[in-house]
Curated annotation (Swiss-Prot):
Family to which the UniProt record says this protein belongs: Belongs to the RNA methyltransferase TrmD family.
E.C. number(s) listed in UniProt: 2.1.1.228
Residues passing through the membrane, by range: none
Gene, per the UniProt record: trmD
Uppermost EC category: transferase
UniProt name for this protein: tRNA (guanine-N(1)-)-methyltransferase
Naturally occurring in which organism (per UniProt): Leptothrix cholodnii (strain ATCC 51168 / LMG 8142 / SP-6)
Length: 249
């Protein structure tokens, strides 16, 4: 799996590639990440990759020609199979479903915009997919690219110490995750300071039932849209529906 990142700030990626549980995948080449400095593809003495927008207005627009030279270099080295992904608030929301699809593919070319944006002609010619990290504005596409790299890499075989870890993540089954507890068993005298007794019981079926109940309760309270989506996908059992009907939210 290979990711080629087109960016004006490759140095933002270096610490990420050498830290955390995903580091093993990057350093071994299991997930190969190539960083491409867009200024290397500017042809003037000033390494200019942006200019003023036609029609006026604030800010600068990233130019088509340096981007196309960079993309040609990527395709010459990596081939044409990987989709070109542009990060923008206008894109489709990044979801765990899309992350899983990308994790099963060959990789992608990640385009990190800056300034007021990228000349639409480059987007129209070359971009295969646009993805948004959320309904807010960032200074560039580097943070969404880092988020996608992390999300995809942790799904690769052997990256996490426990292969079951990502199977219990939020969104792995369309719902939010349940609460987690560790030692000590009690932090204080209040009931909320104690680990729920069911988790100490050693009864696996009861633990699984409690976790599912918590997932449903938290998701219904905080993200009811995910409950609707799970229901539409047929992912809720009759027992799930009975529990949801009994909740006092």
């Amino acid at each position: 799996m290979r990711f080629d990142v087109l960016t004006l700030f490759p140095e933002l990626f270096e610490p990420f590639l050498h830290a955390g549980v995903t580091r093993r995948a990057f350093e071994s080449g299991q997930v190969d990440v190539k960083l491409w400095q867009l200024r290397d593809f500017a042809e003037d003495n000033y390494k200019r990759v942006d200019d003023r927008p036609y029609g006026g207005g604030p800010g600068m627009v990233m130019l088509v020609e340096p981007l196309e030279r960079a993309l040609r270099a990527v395709r010459a080295q990596a081939g044409d199979a990987a989709p070109l992904i542009h990060f923008t608030p206008a894109g489709a929301p990044m979801t765990q479903k899309r992350v899983r699809e990308l994790a099963a593919g060959p990789g992608a070319v990640l385009l990190c915009g800056r300034y007021e944006g990228i000349d639409q002609r480059f987007i129209s010619r070359h971009v295969d997919e646009e993805i948004s990290l959320g309904d807010f504005v960032l200074s560039g596409g580097e943070l969404p690219a880092l988020a996608l790299l992390d999300a995809v890499t942790r799904l690769q075989p052997g990256v996490l110490n426990d292969a079951a870890s990502h199977q219990q993540d939020s969104f792995s089954d369309g719902l939010l995750d349940c609460p987690h507890y560790s030692r000590p068993e009690r932090l204080g005298e209040a009931a909320a300071d104690a680990v729920p007794a069911v988790l100490l019981s050693g009864h696996h079926a009861r633990v699984a039932s409690w976790r599912r109940e918590q997932q449903l309760r938290i998701t219904a309270l905080r993200r009811p849209d995910l409950i609707d989506a799970a229901r539409a996908a047929g992912a809720l059992s009759p027992a799930d529906e009975r529990l949801l009907a009994s909740l006092q939210l």
